[in-house]
Design a protein with these regions (language model features):
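Bacterial Sec-dependent N-terminal signal peptides
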Residues: 1-23
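Catalytic-site signature segments of enzymes, centered on catalytic residues
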Residues: 141-220, 244-259
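Short active-site loop at a secondary-structure junction
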Residues: 41-47, 69-129, 166-177, 246-249, ...
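Active-site helix/loop module of the DD-peptidase/beta-lactamase fold
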Residues: 80-83, 98-138, 161, 188-226, ...
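Residue-level signature of the cytosolic catalytic core of signaling kinases
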Residues: 26, 30, 77, 104, ...
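Short linear capping/connector segments at secondary-structure termini
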Residues: 64-66, 107-115, 144-146, 216, ...
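Catalytic loop of the DD-peptidase/beta-lactamase superfamily, centered on the K-T-G motif
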Residues: 20-61, 187-192, 196-200, 204, ...
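Surface-exposed patches in mature extracellular/periplasmic domains of secreted proteins
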Residues: 45-48, 120, 142-143, 212-213, ...
Length: 362
């Protein structure tokens, strides 16, 4: 019996050693791929992480946080993550819906009955339509109202007489205005302003010390400078946001804190698995076809039984969780960059390539 136990222990140790060596080889490949990609795209700086079974298995920094000052990138740098902000808002909203026993099938008017400044057509939209980008509500971006409007009133007054881009429920079309309304609904359910609610209920509670809302004009400690290509030259990329749009964009956060938040989600410290499944399931269009979004999250069914949820951010960052319910395989890949000179492929594509390398190597 003693000999058998010794043999079993040796077998387990050999198996663990092989798995660790295999992982090292995979990460060498992902690092080599990233280093080549960074070089060809002229990415200024990048932090990335890989999680398997909700545990960090690899993370690394590359390049510069500030090109003009030659400040090296470090793993604790804060990034403006743009539309990744929607993931935080989606989770916070669903927690509030659960507390108040409300539903995404309810309308804007159900949540905000006294908002007569909203057009009647807006008041009839459901929360599900707003979250899944199927509302068709006039998109402020189409009318050159970008993500730093002076006030909510300015956006509403400018758009209230504009036509819908499509009938509600008929088309998946990315829409910024919908998250202006979502912010108002979160504030109503939380009974406090959006920024304060997110700070106390999420950033403080889960010790996300780097998480702060604000555009490039706001001084935020340890934040990278973002860059873009303008006529072949590298210049600063002014990602500007104002409070009316914070539910949709405007969050700044480090890679480590983004990981911490997602681990809390996966550990069901915020929502249940059933609630996450609802958020992550693609919303069907009126035609019966799947749209491109769940409830605030990009959501796709991939080949081989895989699914993917997550979001991109300003075309310079990418957060994606991939899983296969049949094989129990899963991987989360997070790429945060501060821009590049030559985006021939974007972070979402790079993210998918890294995930493929990890899943095929397992």
């Amino acid at each position: 019996m003693k000999l058998i136990l010794q043999l079993l222990l040796i077998t387990c140790l050999i198996g663990k050693s092989y798995a660790q060596e295999n992982n090292k080889n995979i990460f060498k490949k992902t690092d080599a791929y990233l280093e080549s990609t960074i070089d060809s795209l002229k990415i200024i700086g990048l932090n990335y992480a890989i999680l398997v079974d909700n545990k960090v298995v690899h993370k690394k920094s590359y390049g510069l946080a500030h090109a003009q000052l030659k400040v090296p990138m470090t793993i604790d740098m804060s990034f403006p993550v743009a539309s990744l902000s929607k993931l935080f808002s989606s989770v916070a909203l669903h927690k509030l819906l659960s507390i108040h026993k409300r539903s995404v099938s309810e309308t804007v008017e159900d949540f905000l009955p006294n908002r007569n400044d909203f057009p009647e057509t807006w008041r009839k939209l459901t929360l599900k339509q707003l979250l899944s980008h199927t509302s068709g509500v006039p998109d402020q971006i189409d009318y050159q109202i970008f993500l730093a409007p002076d006030s909510e009133k300015f956006v509403i007054d400018t758009l209230k007489d504009k036509p819908f881009s499509s009938s509600p429920g008929t088309e998946s079309k990315y829409n910024a205005t919908g998250f202006l309304l979502i912010r108002a609904i979160i504030e109503k359910l939380a009974n406090q302003d959006f920024e304060s609610y997110m700070q106390t209920e999420y950033f403080d509670k889960f010790n996300l010390s780097s998480a702060k809302y604000g555009g490039f004009k706001k001084i935020i400690q340890n934040r990278v400078t973002c860059y873009q290509n303008r006529d072949g030259n590298l210049e600063m990329f002014p990602l500007n946001y104002s409070p009316p749009m914070y539910a949709g964009a405007g969050l700044n956060i480090s890679l480590n804190d983004l990981i911490k938040w997602f681990q809390a989600i996966q550990d069901e410290k915020i929502l249940t698995k059933e609630q996450l499944n609802e958020i992550w399931t693609p919303v069907k269009l009126n035609s019966g076809k799947d749209g491109y979004f769940g409830l605030g999250w990009e959501s796709y069914k991939l080949q081989g039984g895989y699914r993917m949820v997550g979001h991109g951010g300003a075309g310079i960052s990418s957060f994606r969780y991939y899983w296969n319910e049949q094989t129990n395989q899963n991987v989360t890949v997070i790429l945060l960059t501060n821009g590049a000179l030559n985006w021939t492929i974007r972070p979402n594509q790079i993210n998918s390539q890294i995930a493929t390398m990890i899943l095929e190597g397992k």
